[in-house]
Amino acid sequence: MDALLPHHDGSALHVSTQTPALGDTVTLRLRVPVGYGPLKAVRVRENPDHEPRWADARLTSAVAGWDWWEAEVVVDNPRHGYRWLLVHETTAAGGNAGRIEWLNQGGLHSIETLDSQDFALLATPAAPEWLAETVMYQVFPDRFARSSAADEHAKPEWAIAARWDEPVDPVLPGRSQQFYGGDLDGITEHLDHLLSLGVTMLYLTPVFPARSNHRYDASSFVDVDELLGGREALIRLVGEAHARGLKVIGDLTTNHSGDAHEWFQAALGKPDAPEGDFYYFTNDEHTEYVGWLGTPTLPKFNWNSQELRRRFIEGDDSVVANWLKAPYNFDGWRVDVANMTGRMGAEDLNEEVRQIIRRTMEDVNPDTVLLAESTNDAASDLQGDGWHGAMTYPSFTRPVWGWLTEPGDTSHVTADGSIDPEAWFFGQPIGGIPNYSARDFAEMTVRFTASIPWRIRVGNMNPLDTHDTARFRTHAPAENVPLALALSVTLPGVPVVFAGDEFGLSGDDGEMSRTPIPWGTETSPEVAPTLEIYRQLIALRTQLPTLSHGGLRWLHVADDALVFARESVEATVLVVVARSPLTVTLARNALAWVEPTASGVDGASPAFLAGDATLASSAAGLTLTAAAHTCAIWTLPGVEYPA
C-alpha cells in the first residue's frame, strides 16, 4: 500500500485567494495524513525581496483522516514564492537537529530546495477564467476545408496546387508551397463539427498574407490572405464561432517576418528608412541581415526599435490590438517562437516585449488570452508577468509519447528527399522515440512544471501533437489513444485537439502531419470509434469543473500505470491509466468516499471507461484493478474541508 504524504498545491483547496493583489493576506493550507510524523512544528518559508521570512502554521482540525495546517502570508512581490517546512518530533545525537522535510512544487524533500521550485502566489492580472476551462481545437487553414468559394480565390505564383485527396509532399519546394485551398469560409461551414466534439476554442494558425502554405513568413500584418477569403471571411468566421459559444485566437509571429514583408522591403538597402531599425542588419548598406536560425526568408525583428514596438505591439493602433477589436474580435493570441522573441546574443528583451503585449491586450480587452510557443523548458518565461500559458512539449507531450507510443517503421522522408531511419521526436537527435515508463512520465511532468506557478500551469497546453510535430497516432496503437487523450483532458492544463486527430490521422513529422481532413468519413468504422472517444472525454472535461480548477495529487505511480486525483470541495475525480494490468490498494483516507465496512462495498461505476477496471472499498482500503490498455475515470465526493 502506498504511503500517504503531506500535500499542498495552488488550487483553491489550499490557497484562499487565487488572484491576490500586492499587500493582500492569503491563507495557505497544508494537508497531512493523521499519524504522519508526529510533527513538532509546521512553518511556511516565504522569500519576499529574495530574503527568507518564516510564518508558523497552526493545526486547525482533523477531517477524514487528514490534519489541516494553516498559515497566513502577506503578498509582497508580483511573484511571491513559498515552501513548507515540516519539523518532526525526533531527537538527534549531540546538538544536531531532528528530522525535517521540505515541501515544494517538486514534492517532498529531506534537504533544502531551490527557490525556483517554490509554490508561488501571483499578484499580476490573471488570465480570463475561461482559459483553464477551455478545450482547444487547432486548425491549419489550408488543410481543413474548402468552401464553395475556394475555386474563386486567385492562385499566387508560389503555390503548387494539389487535390484534396492528394498525399502531402514531404520534399521542398512542395513541403512549404503545396496548396490545397482550404479557406476561412470552409472552417465556418464546419463549425458544427467542432460543436459536436465539444471543444470550446478555435486556434487558427496564421491567416496573414505570405508565400507559403503555413504563413509564418507574413508579408503583412494588416490584412488577411485573399487565398483564405480575406478580411470579410475572417469576420464571418469569428462571428459565427462566437454565436456558437466558441472562442477564437489567432497566431502571431513576433520573432520574425517573411522577407516579402512590407516593413522588411522598406528597410532592405535603405538604412535611413523609418523601418531601418526593425531588423538586425549586419552591414551599413542594409543588404545583409540575420534570419531566424539562419533562414534568409525569415528576417529577425530587432525589438530595440521603438517604432517597431509602436506599430506592432504597443497601444491601441498596434497590430496586436487591431485584431482584438471589432470587426475581427479575436479572443487572444498564440505567439510563435515566443521563446526567441527579443533574444539575440547578448541582448534579451523578451521580458519587455511580452509585458508590452500583455499590457496592450489588457487595455484593449482584458478578457483575451496570451499564449507562448516555447517548446522546451519554458519555466523562466512563465512567471506571470506576460504569457498566460504556453505551447510547450516536455511537461506533457514528450513524456506521453515516450510512454504510450510503440514505434514500428520509423523511417521518414526529410525536406531534401533523403530517408531518415529514425522516428521524428520533436527535433531531438536522440535516436528515435525514448522508451519511458509511467514513472518516467510522472517524473517529467513534475520536473517541468515544478518551476511554473500553478495559475500559469493550468493555462499551459496539453497537446498530443500539433502542426509542428508528427501525429501521435503515427506511432501509437489504437488502444493507447484513449489513455493518452484521457491524460490530456484530466491533468492540469488546456487539452488540445489538432484537427484530424479525431479522425485517426497520421503524419511522420510537422509538415507531414498537416493532412487534409477526410470529410465524409465520420461514420465509417475506421473513424467513428475514435470520434466517439474524443466526444466522451471532451464532454467529461467540460462538465466537471474540478478538471479545470481542481488540485492534483498523485496516488500511485508504477512502471506501467498511473493513479491520480483531481480534487476540489465539490468533487474528486479519480483517474487510472494503465498500459499493463494493475491491482493496487490505496489507504482508506486516500480519497473521500465511503466508510469502511468489514464485508466491503461495491465500487462506483466509472464516468468513463476504456478497457476494464473496478474500484472497491473495504476495511483494508480502496482496491483498484485495471486490465491492460485501460483508462477509467470516477467522479467521487469532494474533499472534506475544515469548518
Name what the model sees in each region:
Residues S318-M344, T466:
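Active-site groove signature of glycoside hydrolases
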Residues S16-T17, L555-W593:
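Carbohydrate-binding surface patches
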Residues F140-M201, V207-Y328, V353, I357-N365, ...:
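Substrate-binding/active-site clefts of carbohydrate-active enzymes
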Residues R447-F448, P516-L555:
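Aromatic- and carboxylate-lined catalytic core of secreted/periplasmic carbohydrate-active enzymes
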Residues M1-E133, Y137, T200:
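Glycan-association/targeting regions that enable binding to alpha-glucans and other polysaccharides
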Residues T27-G35, V44, A578-S599:
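Surface-exposed beta-strand/loop patches in extracellular or lumenal glycoproteins
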Residues S617-A643:
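C-terminal beta-strand-rich structural cap/linker in extracellular carbohydrate-active enzymes
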Residues Q105-L108, W130, A260, F264-K270, ...:
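Conserved alpha/beta catalytic core and glycan-binding cleft of carbohydrate-active enzymes
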